C-alpha cells in the first residue's frame, strides 16, 4: 500500500512540475516581457513561501546591508527590499491570526516614524506622485520613495520578534558583514570572465570594465578607488567591535584580534574615502571612552601607539598608495602627493559650490518640499551638467539638505524626532539591557551616535541613511526584546519597634 501511495505521489509531482517547467521554458524565450516577469515572480514566490514562513526574520537581518538584487524584477530592487515587504506581510497576517504575536513594544520610535512616513507620502502626492519610470511612468524619482517605504516596513518586520538568545551573536555579525558584498561591485575587470555570472545577482560599480575586457584601448585612471573595500573594512570593523568590544579587541592575550582589526582598517583606507577614516576614528574614540578604558592601564599603550602611527604617517605618508593618501587627506600637517591632495580638494570644492547653489532654495521648499519626482524633460535639460543633474536628483552630499529640501520643515521635524527617540532607545538598551549583550548594546549606541553626528555635520543622504538608522534601531530592539528599562530593587525599610527592649536590658545586674 505504501508503494502505491509513493507512486501516486510521484506521478502527481511529475504531473505538476513537468508542464510547469515546459511553460516556464516557453516564457523565458522572451525574458523581458511583462507576462514572463509576472509568472516567474509568482512561481518563485509560491516555491519560497514555506521557507519565508520559517526564516523570514533571519534572512531580513542577514541581507539588510547586502547588495544582492532581485534581477528578474523591474528596476532590479535589492533583496532586502523584497524580504522587507514579504516579512512585513507575513507579520501582519500572523498577528491577524494570532493576537499574541505582537510587535515588540517601542512606541517612542513608532510615533515619529509613522509621522515621517505620512509627511513623505503627502509630499509625494503633492509633487507629482511616486514617479516609477521603470514601470512606464512619465516621471523619475520613485525608486527613493520605494526604498524609504521598504525601510519602514523592514523596521517593523525586524521588531516583530526577539532574536533567540543563542543566535544573537550570529545575527549581529551577519547584519554588519552583509556590507562586504559591496566588494563584488569592484570585481569586473579584476577577475576571470567566467565569473561574470556573479554580476547578474550583484550590482556593478563601473560598466566600462566589461568593455575593456575585449578592447585594445583601455581607459586609464590616475587613481582607481575600490569603494567595495570601504564597505568591507567598515563591516568587519563593526562586526569585531560588536562581538568582542573594544576591550576584547585590545586584549593582549589574543593578539590575532588586534592584527585582524588593523588589517580591516587598512583595507578600508585603501578605498580612498576620507569619510571612512572619520567614522572609524569617531567610533574608536567614543567606544574607548564608554568602556572606561581611559581608566585602565591600556591608556598608555594606546597613546604611545597613536603617537607612533602619527609619526610614521608624517614621515612616510607620501610613499603610500594614492588611495590611502586620499583617505588621509582629512588629517592636517601631513605631506601628501599633490595628486591625492588635489583629488580630495576638488571634491570638497564641488560640494561647497553645490551647497552654495541650493541654499537659497530652502525658503521656497520650507513648507512643502520638492520631493524626489522630476520629469524626463528636466533630466534631459541638465544631463550634460553633472552638478545640475546631482541637484535635480536630490543628492546634495549633505544630510540636513537631503531632508529639508525634499520634505520641508515638517519632514525635518519628524526626522529629528526620530533620531532623538532612536538615541534614547539605544542608550536605554546600553544602560539597562541584558549584561550578556553588553558589547553589542554599547557598540550599537556608540555607532548610532557617531552616524547621527556624521550625517548632520560631514556627509549624509536621507534616502540612503534612513535604512541604516532603522536597521540599527530594529536590531537593538530585537536583541533586547524591546526598550530596556531600569530594574528597581526593593530596599528593606528599617522600622523602630518601641516596645522591644534593647539586648542590654536582659543582662544580669551584676554583669
Where do the language-model regions lie?
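Alpha-helical transmembrane segments of multi-pass inner-membrane proteins
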Residues: 1-23, 43-49, 118, 152-157, ...
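A membrane-periplasm/extracellular boundary helix in multi-pass inner-membrane enzymes
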Residues: 5-8, 118, 184, 188-194, ...
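Hydrophobic transmembrane alpha-helices of multi-pass, membrane-embedded glycosylation machinery
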Residues: 42-48, 64-68, 83-89, 262-265, ...
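Structural signal for the C-terminal ends of transmembrane alpha-helices
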Residues: 46-55, 89-102, 157-167, 239-250, ...
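N-terminal hydrophobic segments of proteins, predominantly signal-anchor/transmembrane helices
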Residues: 48-149
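Transmembrane alpha-helices of multi-pass inner-membrane enzymes
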Residues: 239-241, 280, 284-285, 418-421, ...
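Long extracytoplasmic/lumenal interhelical loops at the membrane interface
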Residues: 339-356, 360-407, 426-432
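Hydrophobic transmembrane alpha-helices and their immediate junctions
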Residues: 385, 406-450
